C-alpha cells in the first residue's frame, strides 16, 4: 500500500520551505500553436454549453491562449509543482523569489502554496495537516517561509 504514495509526500513532522526556483525544471511540454487552435475550436464549439463556467475563455482566442498555453514545472526535489505560462522565459522563472506562503485545505488535502508574485504559485499537496509557521511573509528570507505538516 505504501508504494502507491507519491515519493514527495510530506512525512509526519516535516517542515516544508518554499523551493528555490533556480533549480526548477520543466516537466511538461508547451502546446504548439496548432494544438492550441485545435483545442480552442473543440472546447469553444457548440459543445461549450457543457463548460458554461469557462464561457469567458471562449470570447477571445488570446484569452484562451493565455489560460491554456502552460506547461508543468517542478521544484528540484519534485515536492512542489506549478503550471507556468509558456510565454514566460525560464531565466525569469529561475530568478523568482517567494514572497508569501499559505496553506489551504480542501477535504482531506492540505495545499501549501508558495507565491512568487505575478501569478506564479508553486504548490505542494499532502494528506497531513499543514500550517504556516509565522505570518507567511517570505520577504525577509526563506527562514520565515516555512510550513509544518503533522
Q: Can you describe what each PLM-predicted range is?
A:
Residues 6-9:
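N-terminal signal peptide c-region/cleavage motif recognized by signal peptidases
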Residues 13-150:
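Mitochondrial intermembrane space
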